[in-house]
Design a protein with these regions (language model features):
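Glycan-processing catalytic domains of CAZymes
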Residues: 1-190
């Protein structure tokens, strides 16, 4: 804040997907503490959606018991209701849902954020969950689909996980540099 102009806010790094027991109280306490020690600087969270691609620790590419859009809306309505006074923005990770679900989930996320006066961003994952190899840089067409869905839903900001490995020209993955170049070309960046 006032002491260091380069410090503009807080990322509350607990990543959840559903209404985990105690999460509302925990996020509220962390958000309040961040605001209290910094004179009210903004806070944000970046949860994941418990979609069909949420298969960590397995050899599967998808799962059957994914959260529905309606369940997601119900659970996050309750979470946002309990944290909106100390959490200013939410950037849902987009990699655990399928491409044909982006619009439905993004629309619900934006609606809920607007209801509670929160900012709604996207966290565009730049690695591919559709491959049997964990993890390679995503193809630009897939990244573009995610960003366009976020734009259709009215999001005004996008962050990414994870630039240094999956999109940086300095990455060990040659594809990462190509993804970066395609991104720059698409957005006419020098």
């Amino acid at each position: 804040g006032e002491k260091y102009k380069s410090f503009g806010g807080w990322y509350i790094s607990g990543e959840i997907s559903r209404k985990t027991k105690g999460v509302i109280d925990a996020f509220h306490a962390m958000g309040k503490q961040c605001k209290d020690v910094s004179g009210g600087l903004p806070t944000f969270i970046s949860p994941w959606i418990d979609g069909k691609k949420a298969v960590m620790g397995t050899d599967k590419l998808t799962k059957e018991d994914a959260v529905s859009v309606q369940e997601h809306e119900r659970e996050w309505n309750e979470i946002f209701d309990g944290i909106h006074d100390v959490v200013d923005a939410c950037a849902f990770q987009d990699g655990h849902i399928d491409y044909d679900e982006l619009d439905a989930f993004f629309t619900v996320n934006k609606k809920l954020a607007d209801k509670y006066g929160m900012k709604c961003w996207t966290n565009a994952e730049t690695f591919d969950r559709d491959m049997p190899i964990d993890f390679l840089p995503i193809k630009f067409d897939k990244l573009r689909m995610k960003l366009e869905a976020a734009k259709r839903a009215g999001y005004d900001k996008a962050i990414t996980f994870e630039f240094s490995h999956f999109m940086s020209p300095q990455s060990a993955y040659l594809q990462a540099g190509h993804l970066y170049n395609r991104y720059k070309d698409f957005f006419n960046l020098k």
